[in-house]
Structures are given as C-alpha cells and as structure tokens.
Amino acid sequence: MNTTRQWILSLSLALVSFLATVRPLDAATNRFHLSVLVDFIDDALETHYTPAKLDKMMALFREMGIRRVYWVHLGGAREGMFWSGQGSNEKSRSTSASLGGTPIKAAVRSARKAGLEIYGYLKPYEGGMSYSLPAGSPQAIEKPGPSRKGGPVAVASNFVRQHPDLRIRRRMTDIPAGLDSIPIQRIDLVKSDDRPTRVRKEHIEIWTSPDNYRYERRPTDFDFRDTVEQGRVLTLRGLNLTNKYVLVTTNLRGKDGDFANHATRLIRAFGPNHIQLPISVATDYCVWKPKRNFRTYGLEFDTGGYRAKKIVLDVDSSNGDRGFIAFCRGRNEYSPGALCEAYSEVRQHWLRLLRECLDAGVDGIDFRVQCHSTWSDEPFAYGYNEPIIREYRNRHGANIPIVQFETNLLAEIRGEYFTQFLKQAARMIHQRDKRMQVHVNIDLASPEFSNRINPFTYPRNIKFDWQTWLGFADEVTFRSLVLRPAELNSHAMSQKVISASGQAGLPIHFNRYLNQAGQDFEALRKEIQIIRNSGRFRSFILYEGKRLIGPDGAGSVRLRGKYGTMEQWKKLTRQMAN
C-alpha cells in the first residue's frame, strides 16, 4: 500500500512538473481570432508617429476585433537601416526619436493599453536590402556600404556594414584570376527563338562607364555575324573593350521589337581565344526602384529578377529606361545583406535582437526565414562560407574540391547551424516564460512550387528543418505566397504540416497577404471564414497593418477602408464569436 501511495505521489509530482513547463496561451486568444503583422517602418516612412498616434493604431486594431499584433523588429535606431541609416527619411527618423529609438518598446506599451497581445517578429536573415547605389553616383559617395557589383548596398544594418565578410558567400571557384583586366573581344546577343530579326550591325550601339553612372556611347567597330544555334545569335567580334561596365542597345525606335530573351540569357561575353567570361547583367529593373536609367543614373546588377525578366533589346532606348542589356565582369562574392548562420558572431547578433524584444516586454517571438536580403540571379551558388567548407570536409573528406560538394550535404550542415540558433533562442524565450513561434514556409517545402516562387527570397542551399523545430516551438505560422485557403485540403505538404503541428499540440496561425486575398473586404472575409471553419487554425494573420491603417490627414490615423469598414469588421468578429 505504501509503495502504491509513493508511486501515485511520484506520478502526481511528475505531472505537476510537466504541466508547469507547458506555456499556456492567453485566455483571450485560446479560440480562433484575428491577428495583424505590423512592419512598422512602412508606416513610419509614410507619416510621423507619436506615442499618441501609436495608441490610436492599436485601439483601431482592437476595435476591429484583432487580438494579437506581430511587430517586426530589425534593431531600431541602433542598427540604422530605415530608422537612422541609409534607408531612413525625415518621418522615420522623427518617429524613432519620438518613440525613444526602439519602436518596439513603445509598441508594447500601446498594445497593453489596448488590451492586445504583442509578439516580436524577427527575420534573422534580413540584414540589408537587395539593391545598390551606382558606384559613381553622389548617393553612393555620400552613403558608402557593403560592396556589390555596380555599387554599394543601399540599405544595410550597422552590423552588416561592420562585418560584410560574414554575409552568405558565393562559391568563387569559377572566377579566373585577373578577370577585371581581361579585355572583352567578343559579345554574343542571343535571341530566345530562331526567327529573323530586324537588328543589323548599323543598329547596334555600345555604351560604357567606369563606375556604373551615366553611361556614354563609345563608337566601336566590330565584325557582325547573324547565325542560328538553338536560337538566333548576333555575334560582335573584333572588340577590345577594357571598360568596367559595358552596355549594348540599338538606335531603333518604336515600342515593339523582335529581339527578346531573358536577361541572363540575352548576352554572353568572351575574352581572348573565345573563352567565355563570367558576368553579371543589368537592365532597367531594380527591387523597389522599378526603372533604372543608364543615361542619367546607373543600373542594378544581379538583382534576382533577371532570370525571369524578358528583355526586348530593339525598342526605343532614347529615354534610357528600356531597350538595353548591360554587364560587368565577375559575380558578387556575397549576398546583399543576409548573414551566414555558421558564424557564432552572427548567431550572437541575432540573439541580441531577440533580447531587445524580450526586454521590451513582448508576449512571444515569431521567427521567419524569408527576407529581402538574398536576391540574386544565381541563388543556388551561395552558402560556401569558410566554416561551412571546413565542416563539410571534416565530415566527408578533407581533400574534396568545392566544385564536387554535394549541395544536399551542404544544406544539412547549414540547416544544423540555423537550428542551433533557434534552440538557443527557445531557451532564452522560455526562461522569460514567453512563447516561441516559428514560420513553416509551405512554398519552400513543396517541390511542386519551385517554379512558382521567387527562389531568391529565401537563403538557398540550406535545409530548414521545420519538423525538428516543432519539438521546441510553442506555435506555428503557416506561410504561403502560392496557396489559397480553399486549396489547403488538397495540398499534401500543407496537410503534412498541419498534421505534424497538431500531433505536437501546437496552435497554427495562417498568414495571408491582404493584396493576395483580393481587392475588397468580401473576398478577404470569405478566406477568413474558410480558415476558421477548417478547425485547424488558431488565427488568421492580416499581412500587413499598413494596408489597414493610415494617416487621416488631421494628425492621427484611421482605418483606410479598402479592406472593410469598422462596422464590417465588428460584424465579422461577432460572427466568429458564435
């Protein structure tokens, strides 16, 4: 009998101990609810925010029926970027000052006043934006940053600016020594098909620049050949171009040309003995800066959109913003701003950002890997930092050349480092009795979506081991740019993630970009109802707050109205409560 009592007592104590480790959801959020993601820098770049205006934002969220706010934190004024660095403007700097330099602290205070939960939202790989300033431009001279082909990164965190060599590194085994001094002796212009073209020798113009700023025409003679390979190829031979930046256009006019191809396939450059050289290309496209002008400004190289962007070479280029293709020798050695997870200094930096959120008093932390810092025309060439190479050889062979590395094995090593960081983060979060949430990117985990997503918006050559993460996380963000709510039941990977999260006892939150949900409240309402009625999700995350809340013209903020009036949101909230 005593033995039985002791056994029952021991079991009871063990159960109490176990329950003490379970981090319960707030009672107000233990049923289906609405959440919102606030990338506050977008709001602050548009209008100056004071504590009172921030209070009004949170009060409006609460009135709409929202119960949780996710607040993006990139480090505040200490890290520069959009608050005090190259990406800031007068409104964002004044907002930062009025909110004490760390807006997330003010956000927590305002959320508390409104009776809202608030989670910090961290994007570890978000260290700099994937666009640069033309090297010869006044802006680049005034605001130098980490180097890129074409010029310095326009916006980067202070940590990245101080440690540019800790960014994710490209394999550089294909870059010959002395490449910058090799003269360009031949250029191939490659059409996507073999149909005849109107482009002739007399139509082609070559422009150059020493610093990617305000290109100038360079009268150049060359031999011209029009041949057909897999597609039609115009070959320019007998060149001797030593210029750093070279641009090819035509003097043809009109908006309808016939010589087109994807930008990365449109042009090839050769040195002596017809040896093809590695190059980076540019045209009119730039992230966040849709048009670049080669006559009055400069170009963006290796921006990540050129693999899919089709360029028509023989349209009117007199305005400088279309009808051209440019290149420079070589490739970017590092990603624009994403840091490599294998360095302990990087992981400690990420933990500092986490600590700032916890010190601000947030209720939890959500982690996302998708970012704006990895855009490249060759995303799968990255991930070859020295610690990764060293660990690969320790495991698989000391003398293995980098060109023979198996990318799946490389991805496993990198993924282990990132999971190590998340485990460290989990310990820190749970020591504060807060909750940890992790994104599972459905698109990235689904092979069938590989051609439907932008491969450069995620670090590649890395295994994001979401199934392991479920073992130490408390909640899950379900993220997809491709799937609609109505498609979830028929999508195998979605069901796998939902099932695994359910077996782990983790609430799932459905993240949805408002512009992808439709152009009005009714379309959005239907999607919210589908997610709610599925019974598998805890909340619907409205991404993002700036589409809902904006300046009212009288010194405060209001509901914008495009995605519903306040009465419509209140009615929806009442319906969900039943």
Map each language-model feature to its residues:
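Substrate-binding cleft of secreted/luminal carbohydrate-active enzymes
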Residues: 61, 66-74, 466-490, 503-578
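Active-site-adjacent "subsite" loops/lids of carbohydrate-active enzymes
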Residues: 31-48, 97, 125-186, 190-198, ...
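Aromatic-lined substrate-binding rim segments of carbohydrate-active enzymes
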Residues: 57, 75-123, 353, 406-432, ...
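Active-site-proximal loop/short-helix segments
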Residues: 82-86, 126-138, 152-157, 161-165, ...
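Aromatic-lined carbohydrate-recognition surfaces of secreted/lumenal glycan-active proteins
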Residues: 117-129, 366-370, 409-460, 506-517
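Aromatic-lined carbohydrate-binding/catalytic grooves of carbohydrate-active enzymes
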Residues: 66-99, 326-327, 373-385, 485
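Active-site clefts of carbohydrate-active enzymes
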Residues: 38, 321-337, 437-453, 494-527
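Substrate-binding cleft/loops of secretory-pathway carbohydrate-active enzymes
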Residues: 126-142, 437-485, 520, 526-534
